[in-house]
Amino acid sequence: MEHSRQTMLSFLARLPEQEIVRSRDQGEWSVKDVLAHCVAWEAEATRRLQLVARGQGQRIHYYDDMREADRFNANAVRKARARGFSALVREAARVRQRLIKSLRRLPPRALQDPTHRFPVVAWLPEFAWIHEQAHLKEMRAWWSAQKPVWKPGSGVKRS
């Protein structure tokens, strides 16, 4: 989990700030919006882990309807747009650390506990690193398509 976040932040650190907040071709989300979306789901994962730790895993809300998930995403992006990118990066670090701390506090048996609708091992990888890496792959492809490429010997840059 720590590696996936560092990989994401290293990529973002190489982007010009104006590109981070500019809407991309994929939908209307900017790179900043995508990070806010990932951070919101990690905060949700942390909340779920805390419920599991308190023996209240049955209180976890699962987003079975994509409209619900879309509302969750839209709300996360809307809230983040009111803040600066640096503040969001700091929040991403805090949320990831809380997630790791919450996970480490769980006894190993809680990860596979069948009394919850879905055991932690069924949803945590998606919430914590698979999801982030999938978005990072999309953002890298988007950024590669934006950058001018210099071809040796051509004297011409293409975009």
Question: What annotation goes with each model-predicted range?
Answer:
Residues 1, 27, 88, 92, ...:
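Aromatic-acidic/polar surface patches that form glycan- and anion
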Residues 1-3, 7-19, 26:
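Long, hydrophobic N-terminal alpha-helical segment
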Residues 4, 68-110:
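Acidic/histidine-rich alpha-helical segments that form the ligand environment
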Residues 4-8, 41, 45, 88-99, ...:
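Alpha-helical packing segments of well-folded alpha/beta enzyme cores
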Residues 10-14, 63-65, 74-75:
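Short acidic/polar alpha-helix capping motifs at helix-coil junctions
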Residues 11, 52, 79, 91, ...:
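Residues that form generic nucleotide/phosphate-binding pockets
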Residues 21-71, 105-159:
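Short, contiguous alpha-helical
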